[in-house]
Amino acid sequence: MSKECKICGKKPMVGNNVSHAHNVNKRRFNPNLQRVKALFDGQVRRIDVCTSCIKAGKVVKAPTMGQGKVTSAS
């Protein structure tokens, strides 16, 4: 699984763990990625998307089996 959002391109950032004694250790801040079945380039695909893109509505989720059926009211 790649550590990059396919929508916004968000990648891991580098920072520091800082203790109370001000000892510094390097660390990585990974984006919160979720594997989502979505419409991507006109096809239904599983893509890695960050939660901020999902929350902002930038991802069009693929219809599931139950959705999209038209029922007649007779």
Swiss-Prot record:
A GO term from the CC aspect: ribonucleoprotein complex
GO molecular function: structural constituent of ribosome
Organism of provenance: Desulforapulum autotrophicum (strain ATCC 43914 / DSM 3382 / VKM B-1955 / HRM2)
GO BP annotations, alphabetical order: translation
Listed name of the protein: Large ribosomal subunit protein bL28
Keyword Lipoprotein: no
Keywords: Ribonucleoprotein, Ribosomal protein
Domain of life assignment: Bacteria
Family: Belongs to the bacterial ribosomal protein bL28 family.
Gene3D superfamilies xrefs: 2.20.150.30, Ribosomal protein L28/L24
Pfam families: Ribosomal_L28
